[in-house]
């Protein structure tokens, strides 16, 4: 769900049943809700959904709307006679992109969270300028929602969905090549070859101004049967894909957070390297998803938008 006037939005991912989940936060200025319970030592094991939202701290209201939707469906942790949905959340800072930010007493993000939860039941979502990525930007191009998936040699499916609102850049210098270029599959973000060599200018750090708040938030998921500790390891390895795809990442004013979810549909062979392969695949999927989020983004349908151009405006085929 998104609001074209506000230039912000919410993405909700709902689970068919409680899924094992954990998370890692390496950004210096995160905004999250109920992520402490994802620590492997905490009691609650499964989540009913995860929310990725714009709006900075205001966006944390979005989980409330998702909770309401799930409770109406009688979904949640069974505590005596009460259902308590478990829905962690992370937010991005998109308050400086123009748009109407004086929404007053209207529960804007709660309403968008509720709408996003209803929309999630369809199982489909749009890439680019949509949902939690509607108002997202990067240092040099419009950001957005990205996604990618793959199958491991062991037969497990791994996927990633990300809101790319990076403080840095996902592309190399002034050219069209992505830092995630080496892991691209089937030209999914333009098929631009990775440069054979990098110049000093290519390596120069690019940021949104001096040190503005930003954040890239993501979910990686697998059908493998994992423990909470193993999901945490998968999130940690997946986060390396974020660092490969964006320069810089995990900065002092970033809130970079990666959730990992396991649907428990396929057993994991713990005698070999299957868990390591899951983490590697999750990192590759996240790097690809970041590039796709930028490649697919278009400018918001609002004349009030303040931000960089869309990638394909600058690098048209």
Q: PLM features: residue spans?
A:
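A structural signal for small-residue-enriched, beta-sheet-centric alpha/beta enzyme cores
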Residues: 1-57, 61, 72-317
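Active-site-adjacent structural elements in enzyme catalytic domains
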Residues: 65-70
